[in-house]
Amino acid sequence: MRVLGIETSCDETGIAIYDDEKGLLANQLYSQVKLHADYGGVVPELASRDHVRKTVPLIQEALKESGLTAKDIDAVAYTAGPGLVGALLVGATVGRSLAFAWDVPAIPVHHMEGHLLAPMLEDNPPAFPFVALLVSGGHTQLISVTGIGQYELLGESIDDAAGEAFDKTAKLLGLDYPGGPLLSKMAAQGTAGRFVFPRPMTDRPGLDFSFSGLKTFAANTIRDNGTDDQTRADIARAFEDAVVDTLMIKCKRALDQTGFKRLVMAGGVSANRTLRAKLAEMMKKRRGEVFYARPEFCTDNGAMIAYAGMVRFKAGATADLGVSVRPRWPLAELPAA
């Protein structure tokens, strides 16, 4: 079975083809980073227009890469939410139209389920049950996962997501958009301990997160200490350490609460090397396992949508002729497969 996956939820156009026997046959990605850089963030209208320009050509490239034709595709999966409504509508419209033209099923996919299942694309996929840390620019959540669609929300950010906090703090440090990876690179040159940031909401019970205060703390630290290169690096180090420690503390609590031995980390921030190293060390001490996707599958991509679409199709999920998207879509609302 071969599934074409279409991802257009934000500022990446991702197209992939997944075969349930041979694995990933094609993976095409176009990033709009340069388009939005001058604005310091994603401009929804520009994102939508660029998806219109890039989606069909990338589908053609994916078919060429895989050596397949339209007749070889058994289903078309597309991101139906959450995300930017205009961007979602581009992928949904193209996906639904192709499915109709090719006379194959159309499968709406939840963007965050795609991220959650991305580690399944690796050679050593996690087995159920596990705790999932979904950490990206728009989401920071801890999920108890006992099967496909069997998701229980354990905790989430009550304000900024971790990735959003990274980008906003990077902007305060004078870094270009998207600033998160640049901040991490700067943090590697920083001195540990010169500045100490709080670990938000770790002094009380519960699994929720709050990262907006760290941005304010960073702004005040920059104001009081100047912006020479070493000071900026030290502030970046303190900020990253605070976010990573907070995520690690909450993961420990989630594992203790569920009794699970496996931790899955997914979403754009899961590519952060410091976070990966700290969680790997933590799970080794707990005699557990940590799983994550390769870096190119941590950020938005079509491969995770194609894979999630295949899983959902096998569970009987298809869409009608209408095109609908959900900019807001709680993961817990998905049916069990």
Curated annotation (Swiss-Prot):
Pfam families: TsaD. The keyword RNA-binding does not apply. Fe cation binds at H111, H115, D300. Its EC number is 2.3.1.234. One of its GO terms (cellular component) is cytoplasm. Keywords: Acyltransferase, Cytoplasm, Iron, Metal-binding, Transferase, tRNA processing. Its cofactor is Fe(2+). GO terms for biological process: tRNA threonylcarbamoyladenosine modification. It is found in: Cytoplasm. It catalyses: L-threonylcarbamoyladenylate + adenosine(37) in tRNA = N(6)-L-threonylcarbamoyladenosine(37) in tRNA + AMP + H(+). Substrate binds at L134, V135, S136, G137, G138, D167, G180, N272. Binds 1 Fe(2+) ion per subunit. GO terms for molecular function: iron ion binding; N(6)-L-threonylcarbamoyladenine synthase activity. The keyword Transferase applies. CDD domains: ASKHA_NBD_TsaD-like. Belongs to the KAE1 / TsaD family. Required for the formation of a threonylcarbamoyl group on adenosine at position 37 (t(6)A37) in tRNAs that read codons beginning with adenine. Is involved in the transfer of the threonylcarbamoyl moiety of threonylcarbamoyl-AMP (TC-AMP) to the N6 group of A37, together with TsaE and TsaB. TsaD likely plays a direct catalytic role in this reaction. This is tRNA N6-adenosine threonylcarbamoyltransferase. It comes from Escherichia coli (strain SMS-3-5 / SECEC).
